[in-house]
């Protein structure tokens, strides 16, 4: 039997090796189940096993190491998942990373409410045990690689391994993708012989959460033998980001007297960590309230939603009794669901207690006194009120109304926007002789309506007693203006009218004296006692001081008061026209060519300062008594113009032609004007009047000049 023992051992050893080889061929490295659904209990109990995870690297699991994405759970060496403390984590996802020198894999654990999935936890696990894991028939075996972010030195460090059971001898592994040969380059690399994947530096999940890499085998010439096969690298989140309030400033408003539980505002923070983990699960609380009166807890914040609500009775939200209607809250957001290990961030919430019109304005006293001189206008008294509401709102701003004692609308009242006082003004002069006293009833209200349970009381009305002081009023002309119509040129000393001024101070015995104030032409005089106005010069309608036939003068009436008062009256004198102005012609100079075929010389016009009918039609004539020559002719064009023409051509010279023009007044007025006619040479379209410099007279004129010269000898 002994000789057979080595043979038997060899046979047994070959069978063991064969079985082991067969087992290796049937083994797939990794978790036997990739996804687990866990019913949410009322609470995970510390150190209580939740489930068992089965991982195999097909090499005996030597140096097996587990990592859990949540710091509140761990996996024991036997594969049992346990909670490190009593905790709730509804709807969250956990990742378990298993790794040996030969393989690594990741399992996903979804913690859900009992209604989210069908069946019990035991049924799910039973289904998982009876459901085979599908296998991919390929020689390159890859599993997702999980790498915690923010790892420390040393680098590079192995994070996973790719297995190819059928890799030909001499072939190599090649790794490509973002993070390898694409930006950011050089983060990952693979041992081309062993398939070990390593990371060269620490990772930041908030920058890149996953990397999609590709593995393939290539021959010595770089040609692909198998693949590429996708390899996913998942960066496991760490709680390395504090919550941040990004939407400030945070300002909220709540009306005073609001019921308990009134929502003021919402404050939410942002956490850059993985939202599927407690690293970004935020809880809110109020760290500080300023001021802390009348209660240190005026507000409450929903720890999950961030809604800030009132928690005091409406009576404590009385803006008028608060030291300061503005509250500042330091709001803290903490991740890890508010646990002590969580990171925090803070922001300030400013809450304004807004005013409502729950206080009516009240006069500071029931009666006000005012004194005003008759004839004076403007503000005579300021009415003061008190209102406890917010001075920046319509609940405080006052609106005043005169409700009695102002039938003549002599008074108005307006609100001073700075002081809220009522400024009572006289807008029409008061007459002491008519009424020396006035009594007004004033009402005050707010711009905004009062709240339903508040009304205006007796303190919202006040009486104003106004005393009018007598003043020496100026005499008043009646009528004013005074108007009279007279012919111009009436004789000097003619009486135009008698003016009349009365003194409004009927209770005083005063005398009135008259004087001239403005008399631009100096034509008038007034009797200081009786007011009779007469002329001191001829009244000329054509004077530059007369406008549209009206002359204006001003007179003064001064009483004997102390000090005296003076009134002004206006006199308008309408002057009727008389024919006292002779007409005159225009132009008075003309030119004509010595060889002109058209013998027309000039068209004359006439004007008259008088008014119609003392003006046109005008009569134009050549004063024949001094012009016997029969070389000129004048012809009527219309009522105001005539044409002067030649009967024959004349030599170059200056000719003086007397023109007589007569108006249509009764009696008519006549004016004789010399028309100077220059006869010029007009050769080759050039006008030369130099030879016309010497005057030319008619024969009769020459004879008269000769006789005059002889007489002087």
From Swiss-Prot:
Region (Disordered): 156-178
Principal cellular location given in the protein's record: membrane
GO CC term (a single one): catenin complex
Ranges of residues in domain Cadherin: 139-245, 246-363, 364-477, 478-585, 584-694
Signal peptide: 1-22
Keywords associated with the record: Calcium, Cell adhesion, Cell membrane, Cleavage on pair of basic residues, Cytoplasm, Glycoprotein, GPI-anchor, Lipoprotein, Membrane, Metal-binding, Repeat, Signal
Database matches in CDD domains: Cadherin_repeat (cd11304)
Localization: Cell membrane; Cytoplasm
UniProt feature, compositional bias: Basic and acidic residues: 158-172
Lipidation (GPI-anchor amidated glycine): 693
Record-linked SMART domains: CA, Cadherin_pro
Keyword Transmembrane: no
Glycosylation positions in this chain: 52, 86, 382, 489, 500, 530, 598, 638, 671
InterPro entries: Cadherin (IPR039808), Cadherin-like_dom (IPR002126), Cadherin-like_sf (IPR015919), Cadherin_CS (IPR020894), Cadherin_pro_dom (IPR014868)
GO MF, any single term: calcium ion binding
Annotated GO biological process: adherens junction organization; calcium-dependent cell-cell adhesion via plasma membrane cell adhesion molecules; cell migration; cell morphogenesis; cell-cell adhesion mediated by cadherin; cell-cell junction assembly; homophilic cell adhesion via plasma membrane adhesion molecules
Quaternary structure (record): By contrast to classical cadherins, homodimerization in trans is not mediated by cadherin EC1 domain strand-swapping, but instead through a homophilic adhesive interface which joins two elongated EC1-EC2 domains through a region near their Ca2+-binding sites to form a tetrahedral, X-like shape.
Function of the molecule: Cadherins are calcium-dependent cell adhesion proteins. They preferentially interact with themselves in a homophilic manner in connecting cells; cadherins may thus contribute to the sorting of heterogeneous cell types. May act as a negative regulator of neural cell growth.
Entry's free-text remark on domains: Three calcium ions are usually bound at the interface of each cadherin domain and rigidify the connections, imparting a strong curvature to the full-length ectodomain.
Name used for this protein in its record: Cadherin-13
Lineage of producing organism: Eukaryota, Metazoa, Chordata, Craniata, Vertebrata
Gene responsible for this protein: CDH13
């Amino acid at each position: 039997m002994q000789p057979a023992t080595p043979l038997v051992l060899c046979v047994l050893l070959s069978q063991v090796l064969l079985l082991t080889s067969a087992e290796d061929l049937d083994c797939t490295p990794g978790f036997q189940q990739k996804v687990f659904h866990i019913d949410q209990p009322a609470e995970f109990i510390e150190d209580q096993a939740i489930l068992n995870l089965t991982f195999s690297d097909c090499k005996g699991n030597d140096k097996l190491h587990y990592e859990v994405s949540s710091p509140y759970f761990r996996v024991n060496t036997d594969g049992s998942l346990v909670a490190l403390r009593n905790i709730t984590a509804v709807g969250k996802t956990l990742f378990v990373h298993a790794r040996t020198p030969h393989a690594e894999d990741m399992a996903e654990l979804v913690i859900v409410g009992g209604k989210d999935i069908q069946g019990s936890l035991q049924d799910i696990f039973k289904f998982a045990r009876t459901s085979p894991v599908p296998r991919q028939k390929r020689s390159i075996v890859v599993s997702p690689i999980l790498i915690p972010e923010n790892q420390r030195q040393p680098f590079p460090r192995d994070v996973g391994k790719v297995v190819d059971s059928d890799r030909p001898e001499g072939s190599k592994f090649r790794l490509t993708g973002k993070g390898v040969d694409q930006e950011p380059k050089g983060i990952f690399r693979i041992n081309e012989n062993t398939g070990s994947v390593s990371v060269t530096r620490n990772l930041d999940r908030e920058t890149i959460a996953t990397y999609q890499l590709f593995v393939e085998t290539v021959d010595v010439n770089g040609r692909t033998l198998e693949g590429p096969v996708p390899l996913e690298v998942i960066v496991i989140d760490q709680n390395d980001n504090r919550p941040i309030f990004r939407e400030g400033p945070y300002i909220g408003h709540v009306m005073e007297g609001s019921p308990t539980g009134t929502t003021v505002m919402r404050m939410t923070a942002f956490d850059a960590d993985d939202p599927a983990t407690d690293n970004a699960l935020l809880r809110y609380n109020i760290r500080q309230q300023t001021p802390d009166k009348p209660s240190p807890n005026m507000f409450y914040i929903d720890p999950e939603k961030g809604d800030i609500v009132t928690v005091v009775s409406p009576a404590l939200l009385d803006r008028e009794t608060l030291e300061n209607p503005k509250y500042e809250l330091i709001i803290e957001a903490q991740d890890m669901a508010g646990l002590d290990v969580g990171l925090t961030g803070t922001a300030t919430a400013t809450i304004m207690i807004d005013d409502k019109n729950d206080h009516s304005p009240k006069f500071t006293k029931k009666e006000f006194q005012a004194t005003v001189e008759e004839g004076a206008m403007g503000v005579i008294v300021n009415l003061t009120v008190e209102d406890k509401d917010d001075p920046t709102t319509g609940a405080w701003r006052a609106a005043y109304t005169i409700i009695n004692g102002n039938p003549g609308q002599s008074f108005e009242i307006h609100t001073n926007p700075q002081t809220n006082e009522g400024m009572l003004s006289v807008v029409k002069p008061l007459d002491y002789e008519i009424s020396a006293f006035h009594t007004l009833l004033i009402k005050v209200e707010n711009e905004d309506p009062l709240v339903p349970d508040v009304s205006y009381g007796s303190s919202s009305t006040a009486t104003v007693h106004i005393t009018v002081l007598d003043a020496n009023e100026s005499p008043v002309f009646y009528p004013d203006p005074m108007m009279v119509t007279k012919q111009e040129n009436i004789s000097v000393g003619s009486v135009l009218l008698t003016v009349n001024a009365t003194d409004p101070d009927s209770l005083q015995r005063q005398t009135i004296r008259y004087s001239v104030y403005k008399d631009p032409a100096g034509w008038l005089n007034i009797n200081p006692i009786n007011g009779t106005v007469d002329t001191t010069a001829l009244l000329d309608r054509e004077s530059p001081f007369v406008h549209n036939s009206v002359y204006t003068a001003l007179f003064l009436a001064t009483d004997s008061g102390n000090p005296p008062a003076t009134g002004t009256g206006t006199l308008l004198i309408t002057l009727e026209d008389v024919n006292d102005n002779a007409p005159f012609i225009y132009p008075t100079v003309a030119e004509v060519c010595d060889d002109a075929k058209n013998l027309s010389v000039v068209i004359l016009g006439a004007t008259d300062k008088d008014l119609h009918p003392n003006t046109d039609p005008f009569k134009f004539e050549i004063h024949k008594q001094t012009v016997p020559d029969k070389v000129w002719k004048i012809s009527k064009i219309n009522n105001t113009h005539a044409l002067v023409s030649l009967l024959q051509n004349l030599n170059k010279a200056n000719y003086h032609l007397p023109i007589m023009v007569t108006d249509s007044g009764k009696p008519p007025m006549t004016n004789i004007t010399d028309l100077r006619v220059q006869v010029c040479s007009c050769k080759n379209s050039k006008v030369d009047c130099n030879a016309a410099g010497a005057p030319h007279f008619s024969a009769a004129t020459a004879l008269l000049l000769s006789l005059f010269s002889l007489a002087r000898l």
